[in-house]
């Protein structure tokens, strides 16, 4: 099904123009009408143009009438321009059918839109890293993106790793039995841990109670991950959630003086501090295989033994 896809750059400058162009061509080859923003390849220092250029690109994406507004890449840059975004224009665009999709630094935009308007955006792929690969794009990523843009996606599932963490929140909307979880009517939200934790104390972090918070990151040692989780913990963000779902944490290196300090230990430590259920293994993050997740959407989290499901197409 042919869709209008608008590609823009709200964060870091495109580094690999060949990958960017390859991604555009792949989307066109799928039959979509691809419109590339006039400043998509702009560069100012590490950014895709100065703050005004990137703000204008966001607002052009909102005014484009596209079915999908897809970022070229993540990186850094959105947090510094959050005050300049016209959130009413973004909400109107979403109401008219534009789906804003991105990953990584895009978490700042998604959290801000949710906090300011309650509108749903999508955590998903980016052009350069996901569609612009030298090899064929990941099948699961491509299929999830297709489900997103055609409106066919109703949820996602994954296999939990063989790590026993036994605590579980048992409250309103939650059921716990041997090897089973059912959490209903919970807002799905989250994204990149470093970006999300940087929003604590600002008006751009949504005040979600009883939600399902998903997290991912890249290049962060487990002690840094723990420090950011501690910030969310002490700020009261984690206490209000029904579940914390860890995606993929990649590209970090353990050192000798860690002496056994690993990510699994961080997650077990976190579980000991909160009542919410902590799950692992969500296929989302700075990885080729990533699902698409509706940020701000009411969802159902179901676990049966080691099979986990996030469902938003069924009520």
Question: Each predicted region: which residue ranges?
Answer:
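ATP/nucleoside-binding phosphotransfer catalytic cores, i.e., glycine-rich phosphate-binding loops
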Residues: 246-315
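Internal helical hairpin/lid segments
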Residues: 203-256
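ATP/NTP phosphate-donor binding region
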Residues: 1-65
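Conserved anion/nucleotide-ligand pocket segment
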Residues: 120-194
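N-terminal amphipathic/basic leader segments beginning at the initiator methionine
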Residues: 1-22, 157, 162-172, 183, ...
């Amino acid at each position: 099904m042919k869709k209008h896809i608008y590609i823009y750059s709200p964060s870091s400058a495109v580094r690999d123009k060949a990958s960017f162009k390859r991604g555009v061509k792949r989307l066109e080859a799928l039959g979509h009408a691809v419109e590339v923003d006039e400043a998509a390849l702009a560069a100012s220092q590490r950014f895709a143009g100065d703050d005004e250029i990137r703000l204008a690109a966001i607002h052009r994406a909102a005014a484009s009438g596209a079915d999908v507004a897809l970022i070229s890449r993540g990186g850094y840059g959105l947090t510094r321009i959050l005050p300049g975004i016209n959130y009413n224009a973004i909400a109107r665009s979403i109401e008219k059918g534009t789906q804003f999709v991105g990953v990584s630094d895009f978490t700042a935009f998604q959290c801000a839109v949710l906090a300011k308007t309650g509108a749903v955006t999508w955590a998903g792929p980016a052009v350069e890293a996901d569609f612009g690969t030298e090899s064929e794009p990941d099948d699961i990523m491509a299929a999830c993106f297709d489900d997103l843009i055609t409106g066919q996606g109703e949820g996602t599932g994954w296999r939990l790793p063989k790590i026993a963490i036994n605590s579980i929140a048992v409250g309103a909307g939650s059921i716990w039995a041997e090897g089973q979880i059912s959490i209903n009517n919970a807002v799905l939200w989250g994204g990149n841990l470093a970006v999300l934790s940087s929003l604590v104390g600002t008006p751009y972090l949504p005040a979600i109670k009883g939600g399902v918070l998903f997290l991912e990151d890249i290049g962060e040692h487990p002690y840094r991950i723990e420090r950011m989780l501690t910030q969310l913990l002490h700020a009261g963000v984690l206490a209000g959630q029904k579940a914390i779902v860890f995606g993929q944490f990649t590209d970090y290196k353990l050192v000798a003086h860690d002496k056994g300090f690993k990510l699994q230990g961080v997650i077990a430590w976190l579980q000991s501090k909160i009542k919410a259920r902590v799950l692992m293994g969500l296929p989302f993050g700075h990885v080729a295989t990533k699902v698409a997740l509706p940020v701000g959407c009411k969802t159902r989290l179901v676990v049966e033994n080691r099979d986990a499901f996030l469902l938003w197409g069924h009520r």
